[in-house]
Amino acid sequence: MSKYICVFCDERKESDTAHLINGKIGICRHCFENLDKTAYASPYQGTEHIAFTMSPFEYTKSMRKVILDLKFSNCKAYAKLLADMMKDYLDSYDIWDTFDYIVPVPLHKKRLKERGYNQSELIAKEVAEYLKIPMRLSLIHI
């Protein structure tokens, strides 16, 4: 049986304990079940240009660790796992045919140069392909 390392608890696990696996990393069922999930998607009440945002999970200590590893420790493979978690969440909503684009949060040019990638764009690309909605890099970080 193959093994993977859970990105949340950093433990080496047998593949039959996984909620998701991507190569040698994954998310064990125990960690996935203990993530603080949001109750529902709610409209963003900010501007006329952003009608809707959503997040499947609360930004807790464990989620923060994974996101920071993705952003600052060159753990780009984490983006696929986070996107797969987002896909599971999105399947419970039937609103995607009304969306024109998936737009990732822009990264400042300085950060992009330092990091070499935009973690939000990596996740958005996976989600856009899954939903068959074009991804658009139209926001500018100011």
In which residue ranges do the predicted regions lie?
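Glycine-rich phosphate/pyrophosphate-handling loop used in enzymes and phosphotransfer proteins
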Residues: 1-140
